[in-house]
């Protein structure tokens, strides 16, 4: 493991994340809506005050602003990891051996649910066949952030996405270590 990037409720980079963990700060908040949809829990942690333009250049990833937040978070965390690893984007000698292990607990599920609700009148009708936009597929694919980064930097090593719920980040570290 040579580089780590993090976008999380308790930090938008490795240092901020770790400092907030050490301080024991909680970013849990009540969300009554969770109970109304049948969940036993009513708490969650949100990533707040994230602005993609603060992290990537405007033309660096075309269309990224239109994709699900998880894709944006993944690309920004990936860029952080590449910087953390001190990889020189102009030196492609390492590209054949460099891989990406990416993780997300739920990926683009919010976008998938939103589109499903739109196509079924919130689950009350059969799916209506109509255009949903060209960005839908990429917003829902767990591997899309890793693919964007591998393509941009020419990485040819393993490119994998892990989606194992709350342990996805730890699982990605374990897989990368192996």
Residues of each region from the PLM?
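Conserved "HGTGT" condensation-loop signature of ketosynthase/thiolase-family condensing enzymes
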Residues: 1-158, 178
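Short catalytic-loop micro-motif centered on adjacent basic/acidic residues
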Residues: 159-163
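Short conserved active-site loop signatures built around small residues
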Residues: 169
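Short, hydrophobic/aromatic alpha-helical segments in well-folded domains
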Residues: 172-176
């Amino acid at each position: 493991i040579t580089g780590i990037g993090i976008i999380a409720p308790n930090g938008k980079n490795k240092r901020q994340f770790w400092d907030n963990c050490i301080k024991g700060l909680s970013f849990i908040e009540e969300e009554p809506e969770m109970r109304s949809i049948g969940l036993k829990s009513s708490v969650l942690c949100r990533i707040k005050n994230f602005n993609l333009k603060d992290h990537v250049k405007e033309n660096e990833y075309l269309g990224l602003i239109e994709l699900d937040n998880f894709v944006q978070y993944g690309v920004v965390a990936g860029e952080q990891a590449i910087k953390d690893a001190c990889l020189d984007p102009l030196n492609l000698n390492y590209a054949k051996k460099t891989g990406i292990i990416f993780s997300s607990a739920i990926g683009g599920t919010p976008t998938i649910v939103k589109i499903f609700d739109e196509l079924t009148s919130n689950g009350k009708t059969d799916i209506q066949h109509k255009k949903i936009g060209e960005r839908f597929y990429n917003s829902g694919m767990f591997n899309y952030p890793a693919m964007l980064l591998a393509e941009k930097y020419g990485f040819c090593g393993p490119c994998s996405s892990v989606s194992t719920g709350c342990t996805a980040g730890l699982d990605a570290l374990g897989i990368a270590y192996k």
